[in-house]
Amino acid sequence: MVSSTAKEVFIQGITRDGKTFRPSDWAERLAGVMSQFRPGGVRPGSHLSYSPWCLPTSVGGVKCVVVHPDLRAAEPMAWEFCMNFAKDNELQFFEAWAKPEALAE
């Protein structure tokens, strides 16, 4: 489980058995669904950009979604949605204070 002191949670597009998660745009889709959850709440046009609390990225050539802990404080159900998405799809995830530069492309 993710600790309450985590800076960010990186959900990786790799399943527990090492397979690449499909569809290939899963990270963008998840981040798109979460775009409404942002500091200050929903604003006109906010659906046109990702929330700073849930961003798609790539680490070491693996698609990821970075979930910021502020999401948990502001929108606990949205946080649980992301964590349950990872669990339900058996995706690997890890905690880090920032994007691991050693793994970054």
Model-derived regions, located:
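Short, compact, well-ordered microdomains
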Residues: 60-104
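Intrinsically disordered, low-complexity boundary segments flanking structured domains
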Residues: 1, 52-54, 79-80
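Generic detection of intrinsically disordered/low-complexity segments and helix-coil linkers/edges
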Residues: 4, 20, 44-47, 73, ...
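Generic preference for flexible, low-structure residues
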Residues: 2, 25-27, 42, 46, ...
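Short, intrinsically disordered low-complexity segments
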Residues: 28, 36-73
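Hydrophobic, Leu/Ile/Phe/Ala-enriched alpha-helical segments that form helix-helix packing faces
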Residues: 30-38, 85-89
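N-terminal, charge-rich interaction modules
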Residues: 1-33
